[in-house]
Amino acid sequence: IHSCISGSAALPVDVQEKFEAVSGGRLVEGYGLTEASPVTHANFLWDVPRMKGSIGVPWPDTEVKVVSTETGEPVPIKEIGEIVIKGPQIMKGYWNRPEDTKEVLHDGWLYTGDLGYMDDQGYFYVVDRKKDMIIAGGYNIYPREIEEVLYEHPDVVEAIAAGIPDPYRGETVKAYIVLKEGSSVTEEEMNQFSRKYLAAYKVPRLYEFRQELPKTAVGKILRRMLVEEEKQKIKDDSQKHA
């Protein structure tokens, strides 16, 4: 194996490093959307310095900027905002869905719904989906940051973080984890591990170990399905006590 490109979902740095150690090849991350036919960014396949965790640089003839989610104005380098893209590969619109088209296309710019930033060398990073950002007790928390830490644990095979409804904090961070077969890691041990690398408000309040996580046909973990499960549990509990 010489080179591979990863897309569709965020590539944990730990997974990237393990893949390269086992295969001897180079694994780089790219980025794109169906609405962008579908690639807009990629890391270099040849041997040049790369930034781990980055989706790379824009493709030729592709314009990219990061804008404030509140004002729509461009934000400074390394500041998080929404990634918006313009180029020949951007769609003209959704077929027979004019209202949906208006939501994502403005003056030829595609508003991706992804939060990220650009560094001082022109490399871009995706932090998370705008809709997946967790707001707990007034803090903005990005699930991917938590997941990167969880994947560093030697017994973790898969992990995903989500914001579940909380009557006091708005949302609470919950981590869903698949452990290696035979692992005896406990919730408390995972909590202590997380506290070493995360600010206190980012540490998951809840952990759930599962045999597997719900996925799409191409293996992407379905965060929304897990959140819906939690909402259904709350609904069922409220009906029991009604």
Predicted features, each with a name:
Residues 87, 92-93, 100-103, 115-202, ...:
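AMP-binding/adenylate-forming catalytic core of the ANL superfamily
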Residues 8, 32, 56, 114, ...:
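Active-site glycine-centered loops adjacent to acidic/histidine catalytic or metal-binding residues
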Residues 228-242:
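Acidic/polar alpha-helix N-cap and adjacent early helical turns
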Residues 1-50, 63, 70:
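Gly/Ser/Thr-rich phosphate-binding loop
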Residues 52-59, 74, 104-108:
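Short Gly/Pro-enriched turn/cap motifs at secondary-structure boundaries
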Residues 28-35, 55-58, 162, 208:
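Beta-strand->loop->alpha-helix junctions that form or flank phosphate-binding loops
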